[in-house]
From Swiss-Prot:
One of the record's GO molecular function terms: monosaccharide binding
Name of this chain's protein: Glucose-6-phosphate isomerase 2
Record SUPFAM superfamilies: SIS domain (SSF53697)
A GO cellular-component term linked to this record: cytosol
Single GO biological process annotation from the record: gluconeogenesis
Similarity comment: family membership: Belongs to the GPI family.
Active-site residues per Swiss-Prot or TrEMBL entry: 351 (proton donor), 382, 508
Assigned keywords, A-Z: Cytoplasm, Gluconeogenesis, Glycolysis, Isomerase
Amino acid sequence: MNAFTRAWYALERHYQDTRHVLLRDRFACEPDRFERMHERLDGMLFDYSKNRLGEDTLQLLCRLAETADLEGKMRALRTGAKVNNSEGRAALHTALRLPDGAGAVYADGRDVLPEIRRELNRALKFAHSLDDGSYQGTTGKRITDFVHIGIGGSDLGPAMCVQALEPFRRHIAVHFAANADPACLDEVLCRLNPETTVFCVASKSFKTPETLLNAEAVKAWYRGAGFSESETGCHFCAVSADTEAAQSFGIAAERVFAMYDWVGGRYSVWSPVGLPVMVAVGGARFRELLAGAHAMDSHFFHTPPRRNIPVLMALIAVWYNNFQHADGQTAVPYSHNLRLLPAWLNQLDMESLGKSRASDGSPAACKTGGIVFGGEGVNCQHAYFQLLHQGTRLIPCDFIVPMTAQGVEDGRSRFTVANAFAQAEALMKGKTLDEARAELADLPEAERERLAPHKEFPGNRPSNSILLERLTPYNLGMLMAAYEHKTFVQGVIWDINPFDQWGVEYGKQLAKTIIGELEGGTSVHDASTEGLMAFYRECRLKGGGAA
């Protein structure tokens, strides 16, 4: 039995020994529990004291990380080793946010920092030219709107950042179109003037079908408005690893910005893929976003596991996923501007960790990625929180709470923060049957006994609280990088590759075949798929609609 397996079995035994210990009892017996179980970094506080664990649990989890060679894997990530082994690539998103003056970072024996600096500065310069009006459309009018066309990692990160940083928005309105459903792009175009709009096509391969379909639809929109091909091209820019394909699409080289094959889409907002963020909030604010992410990188790479925020987040998630058999995890930002964070986390975690094969291709030795979902607090308290409080499933919760609202301070911010704190406390403490009876003391005994069981809360429901002094670009960068590194650490513990997504590719392959077959002709699929295709053709014949 190797050291990792021994560490794993030790955690299994520890869970059996401590499974009946209640969180409310831990707090009663450990007055210094919060002091020992929270970490601070700049404007962030991470409280993990409301979790089903003790110091002995943390020691065992850190030992598990040690036997998984977490330190060596972190070094490999930072120095450009090919940690994405299935595709033979590095994963150097941390290099994208290195400050000026940082030492060389190598990928395939080449220092990538000069290229990173060049492309970042080009993108920032273009964003500034839109902002100050020096770049204009073909009719000489100032640009008022910027539409980002991308999907997945080329959409979720930028869209979330633009939404989160709305209070810092400058002059240009930024829009997003991801879905190939015509309603998505049409909803954006109906509000825009083609003379004052610039479109950005973001696709790493420049072959993403949803993105190219929308880009072609925009070209048709310009043709309908009387624009020539060359005039239309002036209203486009692109971000891609295949810069030649972008230029072949009709976009001038000076407006094509490079992505890198050593950065995955869901980690790419720090690259020129973040162009809509640069346009929305300006170059200085974008650099603050990078600086916040770099601060978390430095903390992650140089802090011992027991005090390391992303490592602790990951080990706690492993503790619930693999030893307490949790049914998922929810993330709840108590901030309207952070309402897209759960969708971004959903992709980051589930696309990265939804793997059933170990890094060497053998079957994974344990349960890997879980179901991650979320919603905007306080809204979701009136939706799925009932299940968190009184349901039969274990679903740990992350509360993400800015302390100061980006708006009028009229009591609503205090109400929002109070609700976040109250929900975390209620999940942890619960309400005993006797406490429920005491609340119903004014009722007749029979009625009290009938209602009390329904008002009992089991409690012992775990949560993390991640507090931000304010929702600023810097603090947002720290928050995002913390979750990125958490995802990486979970991949190390489970020995899976968090940087590929082959499961996504298979569906794309089948779709290419089915698209042509929907118009008729020979097709060979299972009976269900054939039936669905037949119904589509039937509806098309009845409606006579366009494809």
